[in-house]
Amino acid sequence: MRKLSEHAAQHRRGYFTGVIAVTLGLMLLAAAGTIFPGAPLLQPLTIDTDPENMLSEDAPVRVDHDRLKKVFGLDEYVVVGVVNDSHEEGVFNPQDLANIHQLTEAAKGLKFTITVDGEKRQARVVSEDIIAPGEVDNIETSGVGAVDFSYLMPSVPETQDGAIQVRERAQSIPMYQGTLVSGDGKALALYFPITHKKISHAVEQELRQEIAQFEDTGADYHITGLPVAEDRFGAEMFFQMGVSAPLAMLCVFLLLLYFFRNVKLILFSIAAAMIAVVFTMSLLVVSGFTVHIMSSMIPIFIIPIAILDDIHILSDFHDRYTPDRPRLEIIREVMGELWRPMLFTSLTTTAGFASLMLTPNPPVQVFGAFVAIGVLAAWFVTVTLRPAYLMIVSEETLAKFGAARKSKGDGADRPHGALAGGLRAMGGFAGQHGKLVLAGSAVVLALSVWGITKIEVNDNPIRWFESSHEIRVADRVINDHFAGSYMAYLQLQPKDGADAPDQPFKQPEMLRWIAGLQRHLEQNVPQVGKASALPDIIKTVHRELLGSADAFRIPDSPQAVAQTILTYENSHDPDNVWNFTTTDYDQANLWLQLNSGDNKDMESVVQAVDAYMADNPPPMAMQKTWFGLTYINLIWQEKMVNGMAQALLGSFAVVLVLVTVLFRSPSWGLLAMVPLTVTVVTIYGIVGWVGKDYDMPTAVLSSLSLGLAVDYAIHFLARSRQIFARTQSWAKTLPEIYEEPARAITRNIIVLGVGFLPLLASSLVPYQTVGTLISAILVLAGLATLLILPALVGQFPNHLFKKETLNESRTQAPAGGAAAGAGRRR
């Protein structure tokens, strides 16, 4: 790398031209594919925020989900809750019901053209399956043995009494309670099924435009549902990145300006990071990969890593530069000391992110692969273009640059100031009170391990938005008033080889068992607002056939069950039956409305069903299959967490091998892993103690911990060995470490730690999490490096520095490992 940097410094025009040409070329290819979709050999920018794609297309849960949706004729829903707290009857007044009818009619005609797998398709609101007052049946007796089916709201009522009658009809039908009409009888929920989730945000926008035309009646319209949240996140994701990332870069720029006071020099730091980001994201698009939630965060991960190495070079150059020395000579010295730690920190960081390719989640695999590529791109740009740039800046630009020129007196090589003084004090404390530092670290680790045991793995796409966001507000309102906006489905069918009769789900004992399961879930599982199934239709129709409230039960014979279903086929939407069973009655479906989309709540429901079936076996041996978006989210989260744990352990092992090779010593290799271990354990201990859910961004940030913590440790230990090879004394080495090496590390901590706090201004919670945890990781990794490492080295200096210790017969310091000797000045 030394020769590469020197070659770039001497042939700077060629390197600048080459890097810029490649980056612009990729960017133009990415743009051309997007501007001219369908052009041969070009790939357009494709955005995908569907959490389903966190699993591969052939994942069993996805295969079951797609298959069973077709079996039962199910679609995803856009849910609209209508609440009017200013009217004594809520929304059950003529004007609100007229508006609801108008909104329903507008939704029926919504059609959109979408692109799926490169093909244009039509997607629409499934008008025939809308659940709304004017679209569902009122079921009532018209004499013993006869049932009358009419629309619940055949026309918009003109009087208040007519509006009340609509409510009373809805409340008399158990299937509508908590689903269509709220428990207090004052709010309505509308369910608009869509043929593809990709249109959910477009449907939401069209509905909001229609609602905006309504006369103000005091009613509030809340739109939510998992498809809406997922699609809305994609719509806002790039806007937030377009605001948050530049704010972060501005903050980094201002902090670099504070430290180095030279605009022209620090502009390169920003430019190098942007080159790495543009190169990586353009390559991702050109390669045909979609931009998922994960890959949208690639720039946030590359920027700090790209700036890390540049700050090390700039800090070392800053401390060495004087106008009377040849610049190329200074660059040789700087790169001579830094090339090994910079190369190996880049390799270890690359290994950390590349290990994510071992996870079972395709978007995480793509994220890991391209961050790894971005890290290597940032390394190449930094070690070539930074030396080249330092050679071309004018003397006027460097007139006030260089620490030595600002110092006075005997300490000319030791810059003065609060930062330098504080670091020297820290070094002195770590050296003199090493055992105290180690004891304190042990206590922190113990508490952190305890905190890790409190971590709950949990995620919910709705909570990717701030609590004040209209999606979150709608979610709270709808789930407070109704059974729930989160859908999960449970398919039942006899096990292969089971002694099951023909048409098992016409058997009264089987239907009663399902009704018992429904009742158990609604009464004993707080996350289940409502469980709907075939028994609801059968019991309701049976009651109206006999004209008696006591007849709200499952009939006693399969023939009577068949009669109720045949009667229901005279309704306006007889196909509703097939949402709950198949035409040969060999499968059944339970539709669960959950009031929470948290993975841990879905897991509780699954466990409750398992326990019920174990304690109350069905009349015949049954097999069950869960499906629905809420369940899919549970599965991909489980796979991600397990995959992340395996990837972290694997990358930990790879990094350990790399640093052992770097230092040619297992002892130094293990020592370099200490800040990483402390940082990861402490970060996740804090996550556990504060009650933060272990979600997607929290899991992925463990890889960033690995890269940053090892970066600091390698630089600190490599420079320690270089200095010790010259001083032959740990007591003399320690103060020197807390000069330029410690200042470079601290500048990185401050610049990047503070620089990414602007992400907290984002309205999207994953970006807030990334901003908070990146800052915390940087601070903890820096403290672990600057406090714990010197304390540990101070306990075993003779053992650790055996290779660097001079024998009497030697006349010069040996290479002494990978790091020692790398810094001998030329």
Kindly label every feature range from the protein language model:
Residues 70, 151-263, 274, 515, ...:
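Extracytoplasmic
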Residues 95-181, 194-195, 200-203, 212, ...:
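Alpha-helical transmembrane helix bundles of large polytopic membrane transport and channel proteins
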Residues 238-289, 358-362, 646-691, 761-765:
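Interfacial segments of transmembrane alpha-helices in multi-pass membrane proteins
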Residues 265-313, 666-718, 757, 787, ...:
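Hydrophobic transmembrane alpha-helices and their membrane-interface caps
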Residues 286, 303-315, 339-358, 363-410, ...:
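Transmembrane alpha-helices and their membrane-interface boundaries in multi-pass membrane transporters
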Residues 421-558:
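Juxtamembrane segments of multi-pass membrane proteins
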